[in-house]
């Protein structure tokens, strides 16, 4: 898809940047989850491979791996209770809360900008310290949000 839909436009523009959305789930085992983490791990490899293939065309390819980020899913699971989401997230994120979409967007904007002109093939964890904590707790987190 990249080769057909994206590459020609960026090539015609003389280069550019692609940012893929992966997830912290791509790097850790999580109870009761298989397909999502596997698909996100595959996208990490796609990011690295595209970075190698597109570098000569002045196209940078990176990815962001968000931690828990306030979204429709979390809103629905908690009936809109952001404070509850943050309480549950505190056990899994060093910064003690879920992220905001705008915080992830700031990293994406950086990666798409000229300020990231020497960055390619990298994955940025925008995860409030989740990945620094090591293994996820053995107690599943998603059911706690729905309680």
Indicate where each model-derived feature is located:
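Active-site loop immediately N-terminal to the catalytic Tyr-X3-Lys motif
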Residues: 28-34, 56, 96, 114
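Alpha-helical segment proximal to the catalytic Tyr-Lys
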Residues: 8, 52-56, 117
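C-terminal helical subdomain
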Residues: 63, 83-119, 124-128
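Hydrophobic alpha-helix immediately C-terminal to the catalytic Tyr-X-X-X-Lys motif of short-chain
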Residues: 42, 46-50, 54, 64, ...
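Active-site loop-to-helix junction immediately N-terminal to the catalytic Tyr of the SDR YXXXK motif
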Residues: 29-37, 49, 77, 137
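Active-site helix of classical SDR
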Residues: 3, 39, 47
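Residue(s) in the substrate-gating loop at a strand-loop-helix junction
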Residues: 23
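A glycine/serine/threonine-rich, flexible loop-to-helix segment
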Residues: 56, 67-93, 133-147
């Amino acid at each position: 898809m990249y080769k057909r839909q994206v590459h020609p436009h960026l090539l015609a523009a003389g280069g550019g940047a692609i940012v893929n959305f992966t997830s912290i789930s791509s790097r850790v085992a999580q109870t009761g989850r298989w397909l999502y983490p596997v698909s996100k791990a595959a996208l990490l490899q796609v990011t690295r491979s595209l970075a190698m293939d597109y570098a000569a065309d002045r196209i940078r390819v990176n990815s962001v791996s968000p931690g828990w980020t306030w979204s429709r899913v979390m809103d629905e699971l908690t009936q809109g209770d952001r404070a509850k989401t943050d309480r549950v997230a505190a056990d899994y994120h060093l910064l003690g809360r879920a992220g905001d979409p705008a915080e992830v967007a700031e990293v994406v904007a950086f990666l798409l900008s000229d300020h990231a002109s020497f960055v390619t093939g990298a994955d940025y964890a925008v995860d409030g310290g989740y990945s620094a904590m090591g293994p996820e707790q053995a107690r599943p987190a998603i059911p706690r949000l729905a309680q």
